[in-house]
Amino acid sequence: MPYSVLLMRKLLLVAIVLTTAGLATPWRGSAQTTRVSNSPPIVSAADAPAGTEKLAVQWLRISVPDLGVMLAAVARPSGPGPFPVVVVLHGTHGFAQEYVRWAQDLARGGFLAVAPCWFSGGSESGSHAVTPPIPCPQLPPLKRDAYPEAVQYIDAVVTAARALPGARADRLGIVGHSRGGGETLQYLLAIGNVQAAVLHSTGHGYRPVTRVAEFNVPMLILHGTADGPANGGSVNTQVALARDFEAALRQNQKSVEAHYYEGGGHNTFFTNSTQREDELKTMIAFLRRYLGA
């Protein structure tokens, strides 16, 4: 079955389910018209963006017909492979160099790690915690409620990552920070063909707690107890929402682990080396359990 037809069917099914469920504010983006590419993403080599030349990664262009061109950094472990794959999705502050280094840290843990610029630009909220976004001029910004487009961009990255040389196509996880985590949850419901997900300071604007019975992917929740608007987050990233989601997953006997960092803000991972090291250790151990390495 052609890639575009399969993706359209999956997204249409999710839209039907969400509409008939009668949810009030969550998931309203699902009612938007879905644009589907006529072919799989086209992957080609790219030059290192200005200012990133010293980062020891491979740069790729991931072209998604009708949507734009994503830039992605690929960090590889040493050795011949094949390796399990991890995709790292940035938050609203943009595709900062910190995400490339995050991918490098995961590669040292034994994973073929892909950090894409999956939407361009970046908001001022939380920008103090990271370097300015790496430019992605051939990719538009992502609207606030761009449900279909977000899922399509993530699916294009996942599809491209699975096809990389040395990748284990049957073992792939997603790590999403803030909006990256929130849209990962959307992706899990719409497509769901991954083996693990790390929800990092994740936004719960779509209230995924209302659909916990439909999640079938092992999840790791990493969240600071002080996360909120005062430190780069929002009302949708407050820790109470993460705790409610965890509790609902457990009540539905879903596979979930959670670590809460006392006093940690929305972006403390990027500013506190002690917390960062602990989070990396925790997520690598989790990913190894479900992906191998």
What are these regions (language model features)?
Residues 89, 116, 200, 261-264:
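Alpha/beta-hydrolase
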